[in-house]
């Protein structure tokens, strides 16, 4: 199942309930609805797919799920793209003594180390088809055989995979196994790029500056209006990761972005930015008050008729969140 691009709503596994909707994913201060979703799914023994561009916080989200899961085992994070294909099988499944020349000592692989914990496979889209078939067998049998061995080793683990490319598209292209996709895809969460969440850019930038200043033991530099406009107009291809680096550069007294001022300025105009911020604030307020428009209007200090008008104009979802 997958996130639908309708206010970023999704229809989850039956045991999660009827319907949950949310408007954005915020890595530092997670949006109320996504936070509720994570708290719901974290304790459940279901596998997850995280889809999003580089730097959108997939690793951060996987670690948060592990912290909230209550499982006794570790989170074993594996970057599938960083392991040479010739070593991938031994790294994942482990080896027995004498399995190949130079294998003088038996050792467990990443899958075995994830027993009673979570195996996080980042960039799963780079895994060779031959290894995908073996991973599917592990998920079906919940156990492994080390390379060069015949003994079945039971493994009780949960799997979270992350990808920059939509897995269903890769299935259609023939580069990802359809059966593995359906086995993994109990629930899919799509993390939004920073350019579609302009309302969090400045708060996150300030947050990262404060952290950098604490580490460097210096006073956080002031953010000018001109810099704010520049940050909001930038397209952020590196997403949160690039924003964090920009904050560190700015704290050091360097230009925050190592690009010409006339480059990559493809972000939304100020009017659109303000519209998104207002929509986000109204949505968050509705969520806090269980979608009670009366209570939201009181908190916002806004006449009820005006709030109704803004909800309709901005197309703010008012559907009750059910978990």
Curated annotation (Swiss-Prot):
Binding-site positions, ATP: 52-59, 123-132
GO molecular function terms listed in the Swiss-Prot or TrEMBL record: ATP binding; ATP hydrolysis activity; sequence-specific DNA binding
All copies of domain Sigma-54 factor interaction, residue ranges: 41-251
Residues the UniProt record assigns to the DNA-binding region sit at 293-312
Key words of the record: Activator, ATP-binding, DNA-binding, Hypersensitive response elicitation, Nucleotide-binding, Transcription, Transcription regulation, Two-component regulatory system
Recorded hits in PANTHER family, A to Z, give: C4-DICARBOXYLATE TRANSPORT TRANSCRIPTIONAL REGULATORY PROTEIN DCTD, TRANSCRIPTIONAL REGULATORY PROTEIN
Q: What does this protein do?
A: Positive activator of wtsB involved in plant pathogenicity. Probably interacts with sigma-54.
This chain belongs to the protein called Pathogenicity locus probable regulatory protein WtsA
Q: Which organism is it from?
A: Pantoea stewartii subsp. stewartii
